[in-house]
């Protein structure tokens, strides 16, 4: 096998990272640890006011796309945050529920749902024992690549989906359960403290984003009309 991999004409793919020391460890998702990584990636960001849990959130812009990172599962109350909710909001007059279901069934890395004024695309990351710097970059790269896919799939849906009560309906519960399993968090069985915390964060994600979107100004939403071809 080794010989065949080294044979002439066969090249092993090399992942190129923008970040230095990609195998180095980010201890957790506290802003003090995550901020320098965002700086190194050239992502513009600022800490926002503390949320209801007393944790400051990050508002960031990359390639013209506004997104938010909310440290979660904070072992120290407002620090030692070993989870991170990353999401972007998009304005849309209507969005098809069929399109939402189809997208969520096709892409496990992110999930989407309706929000006031449009829809959201979100991702949850875990760093119980730290996370490689390169993995943070890869996660953000994948998240942003799928934002383009989501916009193409969800923009201009024919029927409007009401956001009222969506976070509590059966479809959302099934998606949260699937997301938990995809992250290695078994649902409805005894779990470690960290696993239980992550599951709680995943379950409350739609309601958290819905409330955030309802209170946010228009400047928090990305305008899909500006995307070429839309």
Q: Where in this protein do the model-derived segments appear?
A:
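A short, solvent-exposed beta-edge/loop patch
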Residues: 17-18, 108-152
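Soluble non-cytosolic domains of exported or imported proteins
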Residues: 24-32, 90, 94, 130-137, ...
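Sec/Tat signal peptide C-region and signal peptidase I cleavage site
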Residues: 8-13
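Sec-dependent N-terminal signal peptides
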Residues: 1-5
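Short, internal acidic amphipathic alpha-helical interface segments
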Residues: 20, 80-122, 154, 165-176
């Amino acid at each position: 096998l080794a010989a065949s991999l080294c044979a002439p004409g066969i090249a092993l793919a090399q992942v190129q990272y923008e970040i230095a020391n990609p195998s180095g460890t980010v201890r957790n998702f506290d802003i003090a640890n995550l901020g320098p990584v965002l700086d190194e990636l050239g992502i513009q960001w600022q800490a926002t006011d503390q949320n209801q849990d007393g944790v400051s959130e990050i508002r960031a812009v990359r390639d013209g796309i506004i997104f938010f990172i909310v440290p979660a599962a904070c072992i120290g109350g407002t620090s030692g945050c070993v989870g991170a909710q990353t999401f972007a909001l998009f304005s849309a007059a209507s969005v098809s529920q069929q399109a939402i279901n189809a997208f969520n069934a096709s892409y496990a890395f992110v999930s989407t749902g309706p929000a006031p004024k449009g829809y959201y695309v979100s991702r949850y990351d875990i760093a119980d024992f730290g996370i490689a710097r390169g993995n943070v970059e890869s996660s953000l790269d994948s998240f942003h690549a799928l934002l383009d896919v989501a916009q193409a799939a969800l923009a201009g849906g024919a029927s409007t989906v009401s956001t009222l009560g969506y976070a509590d309906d059966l479809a959302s519960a099934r998606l949260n359960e699937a997301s938990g399993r995809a992250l290695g968090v078994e649902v409805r069985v005894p779990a470690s403290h960290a696993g239980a915390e992550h599951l709680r964060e995943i379950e409350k994600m739609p309601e958290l984003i819905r409330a955030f979107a309802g209170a946010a100004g228009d400047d928090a939403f990305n305008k899909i009309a500006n995307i070429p071809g839309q």
